Amino acid sequence: MNDSQAIIEEAFERRAEISPRKAETLVKDAVEEALHLLDTGEARVAEKQNGEWIVNEWLKKAVLLSFRLSDNVFIKGGYTNYFDKVPSKYADYSSRDFRQDEVRIVPPASVRKGAFIAPSVVLMPSYVNIGAYVDRGTMVDTWATVGSCAQIGKNVHLSGGVGIGGVLEPLQAKPTIIEDNCFIGARSEIVEGVIVEEGSVISMGVFIGQSTRIYHRETGTISYGRVPAGSVVVPGNLPSQDGKYSLYCAIIVKQVDERTRSKVGINELLRNI
């Protein structure tokens, strides 16, 4: 445990006492350092170790403490003004800074300070919240939202209007995670710490939370909270036991390997179901 982590852990236990005018400089500095680590990608709220996603709870605590340490302030935007506790990531960026980061940010995309945007990411008019991590080569399309602490992998496509849910509390809960090389179709919602594993294709209009049934067509089994690697998922319904009604579910219609996915377009995968 480093010094900043220890300070944040201790301060979080008495967070009800903390306010912008009632906090030690030591705590403010530790939180600021943690947010800097998140902002630059040197640390992340969750990381994959030995095939499992591990949550760094102290970084979540730092984000939550930052809300208690900050007043709302006037924030000037290109077309309007704002009033919030968290500054914009790019408020002080110059043209040189953007070129150095190798990112493309289309107005009026909004990224909060404390989110990491990797090189070669394209943000169409979209929103990325504090603590989020967006890895290389990812496209965040128009009106898509990436929630607090969400983890987005390399070469992911978040289509128009996609919602990736944020998870700050409970602290031990995994954030919503979209692994490398996934495609999330327009207006789909992945929330509540659901994990979409590498190379999966989510069709348009699929909604998956922790209580959503995920039906595997090939095996007839039902699972929750995780989409296995290489899955092709569409929206559907399952009948009730008495046959009187049906309820929504997400259906895994097939699973494909990387070789198949590289040869076959996304539309082809979704048509041949």
Curated annotation (Swiss-Prot):
SUPFAM superfamilies: Trimeric LpxA-like enzymes. Pfam families: Hexapep_2, THDPS_N_2. Keywords: Acyltransferase, Amino-acid biosynthesis, Cytoplasm, Diaminopimelate biosynthesis, Lysine biosynthesis, Repeat, Transferase. It is an enzyme of class 2 (transferase). InterPro entries: DapD_Trfase_Hexpep_rpt_fam (IPR005664), Hexapep (IPR001451), Hexapep_transf_CS (IPR018357), THP_succinylTrfase_dom1 (IPR023180), THP_succinylTrfase_N_sf (IPR037133), Trimer_LpxA-like_sf (IPR011004). Its EC number is 2.3.1.117. One of its GO terms (biological process) is diaminopimelate biosynthetic process. Gene3D superfamilies: Hexapeptide repeat proteins, Tetrahydrodipicolinate-N-succinyltransferase, N-terminal domain. GO terms for cellular component: cytoplasm. Substrate binds at R104, D141. Pathway: Amino-acid biosynthesis; L-lysine biosynthesis via DAP pathway; LL-2,6-diaminopimelate from (S)-tetrahydrodipicolinate (succinylase route): step 1/3. GO terms for molecular function: 2,3,4,5-tetrahydropyridine-2,6-dicarboxylate N-succinyltransferase activity; nucleotidyltransferase activity. It is found in: Cytoplasm. CDD domains: LbH_THP_succinylT. It catalyses: (S)-2,3,4,5-tetrahydrodipicolinate + succinyl-CoA + H2O = (S)-2-succinylamino-6-oxoheptanedioate + CoA. PROSITE patterns: HEXAPEP_TRANSFERASES. PANTHER family: 2,3,4,5-TETRAHYDROPYRIDINE-2,6-DICARBOXYLATE N-SUCCINYLTRANSFERASE, MOLYBDENUM COFACTOR GUANYLYLTRANSFERASE. NCBIfam families: dapD, PRK11830.1. Belongs to the transferase hexapeptide repeat family. Homotrimer. This is 2,3,4,5-tetrahydropyridine-2,6-dicarboxylate N-succinyltransferase. It comes from Nitrosococcus oceani (strain ATCC 19707 / BCRC 17464 / JCM 30415 / NCIMB 11848 / C-107). The gene is dapD.
